[in-house]
């Protein structure tokens, strides 16, 4: 946890923060934020920028950002710990696994935009004066989004919807809030999902998860033409972000009698999902195509 940077070792099992949620391994992010705040930290969750990240680093603050994942991980958090002005690279650190990176600013920003450029800052309370006159975009609504995610994983679906409706009332241009809302409506098989996802991509045309959500929605509705269309749009934005999306598009393509396209997708699925539990079944299916 970034609190270690400030010399504070907070046990993850304190106050039950390490409890598991449905479909989530370990604690969710809002639990860690709440725990840090109980130990005297202040948090800010907002839409950032490359310039803002550099400003925080110059202030001695290591910001956390939400960026695309890879293979079976749809997204993850990374810490920006520095930057190289000559090479125009951002220096990043991911605690698990223990890895560092030096990512070109253009590439970093391109990927970061896919999730709304979310920035999380955790600082000791005696440093909050640094943010006194800051106008942080989506600060309140992003916090609500994180709280809604907790409710969602606790099974309180309608509580999460209520939270997210509040978030979009506060900030109608918050793409994260609209996409999360779309995700819940998608789980409920509600047509409201389409409305929310379309609002998301109108605000942010590069919002990968919204296009993927639309693909999932139409796949369930057996509208395979639209399912393939939206999965393809996701893949165009980032072809390496989430291996299982190729299997979903393969299903749609099979229904559209595009066997060659489905075969290509299943091969990519296995390449990009090294731990696929259905590898044997997929390999058998490939032999039939």
Question: Which functions belong to the PLM regions below?
Answer:
Residues 3-5, 9-10, 14-123, 131, ...:
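Conserved active-site-adjacent core of cysteine acyl-enzyme catalytic domains
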Residues 141, 175-176, 208-209, 242-244, ...:
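Helix-start (N-cap) detector for alpha-helical repeat units in TPR-like alpha-solenoids
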Residues 155-162, 187-199, 221-233, 257-265, ...:
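Structural signature of tandem alpha-helical TPR/SEL1-like repeats
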Residues 170, 203, 237-238, 272:
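Structural marker of alpha-solenoid helical repeat scaffolds
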Residues 255, 260-289:
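Terminal, low-structured helical/coil segments at or just beyond the last alpha-helical repeat
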């Amino acid at each position: 946890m970034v609190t270690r940077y400030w010399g504070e070792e907070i046990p993850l099992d304190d106050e039950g923060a390490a409890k598991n949620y449905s479909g989530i391994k370990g604690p969710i992010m809002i639990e860690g934020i709440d725990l840090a705040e109980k130990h005297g930290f202040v948090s800010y969750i907002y839409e950032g920028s490359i310039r803002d990240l550099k400003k925080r680093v110059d202030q001695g603050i290591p910001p956390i950002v939400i960026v695309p994942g890879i293979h079976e991980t749809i997204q993850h958090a990374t810490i920006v710990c520095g930057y190289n002005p000559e090479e125009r690279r951002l220096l990043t650190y991911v605690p698990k696994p223990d890895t560092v990176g030096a990512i070109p600013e253009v590439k970093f920003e391109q990927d970061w935009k896919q999730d709304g450029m979310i920035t999380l800052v955790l600082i000791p309370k005696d440093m909050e004066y640094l943010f006194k006159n800051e106008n942080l975009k989506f600060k309140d609504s992003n916090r609500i989004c994180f709280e809604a995610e907790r409710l969602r994983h606790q099974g309180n679906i309608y509580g999460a919807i209520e939270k997210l409706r509040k978030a979009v009332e506060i900030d109608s241009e918050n793409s994260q809030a609209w996409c999360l809302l779309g995700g819940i409506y998608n789980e409920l098989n509600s047509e409201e999902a389409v409305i929310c996802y379309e609002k998301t991509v109108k605000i942010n045309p590069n919002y990968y998860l919204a296009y993927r959500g639309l693909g999932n929605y139409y796949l369930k509705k057996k509208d395979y033409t639209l399912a393939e269309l939206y999965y393809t749009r996701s893949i165009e934005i980032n072809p390496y972000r989430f291996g299982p999306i190729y299997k979903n598009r393969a299903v749609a393509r099979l229904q559209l009698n595009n066997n060659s396209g489905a075969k290509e997708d299943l091969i990519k699925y296995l390449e990009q999902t090294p731990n696929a539990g259905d590898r044997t079944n997929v390999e058998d299916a490939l032999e039939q195509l």
